[in-house]
Amino acid sequence: MSEGESKSTHFGYKTVEADKKAELVAGVFHSVAAKYDIMNDVMSFGIHRFWKRHTIEVSGARPGMKVLDLAGGTGDLTAKFSHLVGDKGEVVLADINDSMLKVGRTKLRDKGIVNNVSYVQANAEALPFPDNHFDIITIAFGLRNVTDKDAALRSMNRVLKPGGKLLVLEFSKPQHEIMRKVYDLYSFKVLPKMGELITKDADSYEYLAESIRMHPDQDTLKQMMVDAGFEQVDYTNMTDGIVALHRGYKF
């Protein structure tokens, strides 16, 4: 790359300047924030609740722990963690998108979840937290939207305590051909129509489908976590690999 030439990355299937992607992704989530929870239930037939519940179970969160729910959006995981860590624990819901943070804050406060939760607008690539600060970090359905995923994983490793655990819940690659065909049909034909009907925004859900296809597969993400300094990295496929939960530790 010549001096002064801009780096590029992908926004769905489009190639864009790397420094423009965050703004484009922000536009997607500003658009869908108000109907985000409804769309999650509709487009996953409610199965996202099972995926998130499994993530909570695997986390091993206990009273007194500090948890970072990164790209935490509307707060589904934060709500569960708040109960698990108790009054002596702390949960930070961090998201780069202020519209999502506002929805999450309002939802959790309406549920009476206020005492041990704080909200931070933050870029995953440069987390504004001290070194060795959190016992658990989760990032659910957020990593694929990050421009520099390697930088984000290194940043997560930095703020995780020794002995701490990172959980990455993300759309991935179906394991069987018939599921891949059904999933492609659903993603590219049905999902945008749902988005248009419910949020009046088909384009954002076209981006969703494309961003999933451009995201690293299970083994590639596993190696990226290893390269970022995580150890004992493994993953569990759910729903035939439509979603994978990656787990890594910092020692």
Curated annotation (Swiss-Prot):
PANTHER family: 2-METHOXY-6-POLYPRENYL-1,4-BENZOQUINOL METHYLASE, MITOCHONDRIAL, METHYLTRANSFERASE. It catalyses: a 2-demethylmenaquinol + S-adenosyl-L-methionine = a menaquinol + S-adenosyl-L-homocysteine + H(+); a 2-methoxy-6-(all-trans-polyprenyl)benzene-1,4-diol + S-adenosyl-L-methionine = a 5-methoxy-2-methyl-3-(all-trans-polyprenyl)benzene-1,4-diol + S-adenosyl-L-homocysteine + H(+). Disulfide bonds: none annotated. This is Ubiquinone/menaquinone biosynthesis C-methyltransferase UbiE. Pfam families: Ubie_methyltran (PF01209). PROSITE patterns: SAM_MT_UBIE, UBIE_1, UBIE_2. GO terms for biological process: aerobic respiration; menaquinone biosynthetic process; methylation. S-adenosyl-L-methionine binds at T74, D95, N123, A124. Belongs to the class I-like SAM-binding methyltransferase superfamily. MenG/UbiE family. GO terms for molecular function: 2-methoxy-6-polyprenyl-1,4-benzoquinol methyltransferase activity; demethylmenaquinone methyltransferase activity. It is an enzyme of class 2 (transferase). HAMAP family: MenG_UbiE_methyltr (MF_01813). Keywords: Menaquinone biosynthesis, Methyltransferase, S-adenosyl-L-methionine, Transferase, Ubiquinone biosynthesis. Pathway: Quinol/quinone metabolism; menaquinone biosynthesis; menaquinol from 1,4-dihydroxy-2-naphthoate: step 2/2; Cofactor biosynthesis; ubiquinone biosynthesis. It comes from the Bacteria. The lineage of its organism: Bacteria, Pseudomonadati, Pseudomonadota, Gammaproteobacteria, Alteromonadales. Methyltransferase required for the conversion of demethylmenaquinol (DMKH2) to menaquinol (MKH2) and the conversion of 2-polyprenyl-6-methoxy-1,4-benzoquinol (DDMQH2) to 2-polyprenyl-3-methyl-6-methoxy-1,4-benzoquinol (DMQH2). Its EC number is 2.1.1.163, 2.1.1.201. InterPro entries: SAM-dependent_MTases_sf, UbiE/COQ5_MeTrFase, UbiE/COQ5_MeTrFase_CS. It comes from Shewanella sp. (strain W3-18-1). NCBIfam families: MenG_MenH_UbiE (TIGR01934), PRK00216.1-1 (NF001240), PRK00216.1-3 (NF001242), PRK00216.1-5 (NF001244).
